[in-house]
Curated annotation (Swiss-Prot):
Belongs to the universal ribosomal protein uL14 family. Gene3D superfamilies: Ribosomal protein L14 (2.40.150.20). Keywords: Ribonucleoprotein, Ribosomal protein, RNA-binding, rRNA-binding. Pfam families: Ribosomal_L14. The keyword Ribonucleoprotein applies. InterPro entries: Ribosomal_uL14 (IPR000218), Ribosomal_uL14_bac-type (IPR005745), Ribosomal_uL14_CS (IPR019972), Ribosomal_uL14_sf (IPR036853). This is Large ribosomal subunit protein uL14. The gene is rplN. GO terms for biological process: translation. It comes from Neisseria gonorrhoeae (strain ATCC 700825 / FA 1090). It comes from the Bacteria. Binds to 23S rRNA. Forms part of two intersubunit bridges in the 70S ribosome. GO terms for molecular function: large ribosomal subunit rRNA binding; structural constituent of ribosome. Part of the 50S ribosomal subunit. Forms a cluster with proteins L3 and L19. In the 70S ribosome, L14 and L19 interact and together make contacts with the 16S rRNA in bridges B5 and B8. One of its GO terms (cellular component) is cytosolic large ribosomal subunit.
């Protein structure tokens, strides 16, 4: 469950380390984002010679949440941290590698690239 001002780890090699959610996309009254939702983020911490700089604003997709995601069979998949993958304006991943597991909920046509790059899909 991600809302405005939430700090997330970055799960790709785009050069950002931590980002802050500045908007949950998908309607003016939308308050929370979960796994698979697109959010607008600001880079708060970046590696020195990375692709992105501190202060840059990007779209991102949430790939892990500490709140977890409930499956239709009743299983609850939780993670230790909140993490996102940065996207460009065409909603393609900025990085070329994904770190850590991602959930099966990302297996939509839009995010198949992220699922294929991930080392583990839960």
């Amino acid at each position: 469950m991600i809302q405005m001002q939430t700090i997330l780890d970055v799960a790709d090699n785009s050069g950002a380390r931590r980002v802050m959610c500045i908007k949950v996309l998908g309607g003016s009254k939308r308050r929370y984002a979960s796994v698979g939702d697109i959010i607008k983020v600001a880079v708060k911490d970046a590696v020195p010679r990375g692709r992105v700089k501190k202060g840059d604003v990007y779209n991102a997709v949430v790939v892990r949440t500490a709140k977890g995601v409930r499956r239709p069979d009743g299983a609850l998949i939780k993670f230790d941290n909140n993490a996102a993958v940065l996207l460009n304006n065409k909603l393609e991943p900025l990085g070329t590698r994904i770190f850590g597991p991602v959930t099966r909920e990302l297996r939509t046509e839009r995010f198949m690239k992220i699922v294929s790059l991930a080392p583990e899909v839960l």
